[in-house]
């Protein structure tokens, strides 16, 4: 999403200065954008108040200890973010899914801190397409309702990725700035590498045998679903694929999913047609490798997005409404399944796996039609109105 955002901005505003707010250390020499440190403590210091003062003291003490023990880490810079924000013209939030009753209070407060900072420093803000809700908060999170109602009224535009999220924000919190839009990666027709990278990135992907299917699991599915039931499902799905002379590849879209890939491979320890790819693919590499498959069985949202963007059909095994609405955009809703505990319809999944084996070429054409429709609009077109409106 970051690379698409930079590409879209550079296309519209070639001379703009772009900063990626991150807690990580990136080699900026590789990119056509800069970074600004965006750690929790720096955010709290920039927000001020008692919490900000406390975090400032903690930072000073921590740096003093590092000096005493000669810890080789850059120190200081407590007010970097506070000095930086008044100079910014626009904040673009490209979070994926951070607000809803499935997340803990602290994580949601940190998400809302982004809006608090924009509001405090009077910076225009756009929340790019992301998932919201449900908001059936337990008693200890009830205060979030008032915070969401107040803070999400500040951004110039709040893009909800799903209809359900848009309806919840409009009806539950009476927000007037909400619009619905598909995922920004799906809307992007082409990533302009020259506008994003200072050096052409090296893309390394393994060779994939013909007549192959990718399986892209998601660790979160095993948190929302039942482990043994899911492993049994994967075993039966892979049996269906193998019986159709298909090569099966297990690969991860996120680092944390390698353990799940390994668990599934352990179901077929001696079968040479079940391949475990341990590669830590970049988003560009994942995009390149997914094109090699006839279709994919995916549980990662952006794994499905990259598949659809390359007109690769998917059977989606998901745990939230966002998966079904994504499939709906691509005329693929029959292939999206809820695999949360007590919701696994194993017979239907196996039925549609067999159907996909027979019809994946026809499904590709349906996806092409859906993708063409999605790409007729672009959420970044709103920026001209926001900046100059």
Placement of each model-derived feature along the sequence:
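Active-site anion-handling motifs in enzyme catalytic cores
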Residues: 1-389
